[in-house]
Amino acid sequence: MTHLSDLDIANQSTLQPIKDIAASVGISEDALEPYGHYKAKIDINKITPRENKGKVVLVTAMSPTPAGEGKSTVTVGLADAFHELNKNVMVALREPALGPTFGIKGGATGGGYAQVLPMEDINLHFNGDFHAITTANNALSAFIDNHIHQGNELGIDQRRIEWKRVLDMNDRALRHVNVGLGGPTNGVPREDGFNITVASEIMAILCLSRSIKDLKDKISRITIGYTRDRKPVTVADLKVEGALAMILKDAIKPNLVQSIEGTPALVHGGPFANIAHGCNSILATETARDLADIVVTEAGFGSDLGAEKFMDIKAREAGFDPAAVVVVATIRALKMHGGVAKDNLKEENVEAVKAGIVNLERHVNNIKKFGVEPVVAINAFIHDTDAEVEYVKSWAKENNVRIALTEVWEKGGKGGVDLANEVLEVIDQPNSFKPLYELELPLEQKIEKIVTEIYGGSKVTFSSKAQKQLKQFKENGWDNYPVCMAKTQYSFSDDQTLLGAPSGFEITIRELEAKTGAGFIVALTGAIMTMPGLPKKPAALNMDVTDDGHAIGLF
């Protein structure tokens, strides 16, 4: 049986005019800023806040295979299922990054009949937010180098500049570069480097800001580097926070699109969850809560990464409690964690599913530690067998875990009704949500708490560099920030080959980064990179554009 590609399905779908989608959730035309017929930005100042805000349903996942487990697909499909049940619902997603689109992942707007549209636009340049973020980030780099070139009044030590340039592309050759070469007229030579745009602190700030004023305040607090006597230098010292916020004045507005089934969708912001905090913008989520009774959103990768950061960073900053958490599981991921090689994942292997269930179990238990009841969604794939699915259902029953087989890829919203009904039962009950740790704990204790309670590790080792940074950050008054772990998504440990539910391992913190604008401390583990590289055969090899301007190969 031949299945249509995601792009084919998207191209065959009929989109509603964006003003009709807006009207369906009460967005007035004067609050709508159309970008063509099917996309728009929303002027949040023209949205009336409501007292009884919508409930937030978070979608996370077990530790994924390299292909991903369909978390975005389930997120969109669950929202469509609520729509099918006549619930007032919106979906809130992150924007895809170009780098992974051309790399290993392809597009990131859901899949099958559970997609947000127009998928070509969203997966490519969309409404220009990432370009604005890239421009603001690199403008700051230009201001820093110009300040040094023009006499360096602030006494910035060019050996201790923390701020890097960014590009929305996977480009390993740019990780370490030299700038200012070619003589005195070209600036002061120094070492620099590039991160991918989604790792930029500007991206995190945009996603954690509540208003233009908040955006400007957070930008002003960015630490760009240090003086020769190790004093922090901020954007406020350079006096360019206003200019940077001006570049972002449109990017901060949430983007409105729609699912295949006409469910309104806010797609805004896109930090990675393995190297950043992995959640869409607070503004988009809060706007959706003012417009809908239920808001379905996602956080990147597994509960150890995106969901933990959603709870400890985003929800804490925004001041809301998630009403329910869906944990996406797939039979292929369970088999991978049960020891099956990538090439054999399509073959039935119930014993491997049994062996791999420990990974799902830990993710389920992680959610419970935040005081929220999890619901497992088995995201169906065509190679799953009845015996494999039945084992997972029986495991859930034995462990009193809510579970539903989800077929939204094939059936759209109708394939997610069972999941929606399970979630409805959870959100109607009170929960006892609380973050994992108190902000008053010392940084090293917050890190140890994440490693031991969420990852299952036994010990945290800090490199000599990280130990010095802990001391320096405490002296600078940064000890009360939440922690954003930078770690592989494939394992609970910092070794991506250690699958299943390992325990007793040590995690090494090799370096810390102070994101004083965004308001968190990044702890880098293992070999995690903030500028990815492309694989040997990138997805770009299968992409093209037709003579009439339509994309080919965006999955």
From Swiss-Prot:
It catalyses: (6S)-5,6,7,8-tetrahydrofolate + formate + ATP = (6R)-10-formyltetrahydrofolate + ADP + phosphate. InterPro entries: Formate_THF_ligase, Formate_THF_ligase_CS, P-loop_NTPase. ATP binds at residues 65-72. Its EC number is 6.3.4.3. HAMAP family: FTHFS (MF_01543). Belongs to the formate--tetrahydrofolate ligase family. This is Formate--tetrahydrofolate ligase. It comes from Staphylococcus aureus (strain NCTC 8325 / PS 47).
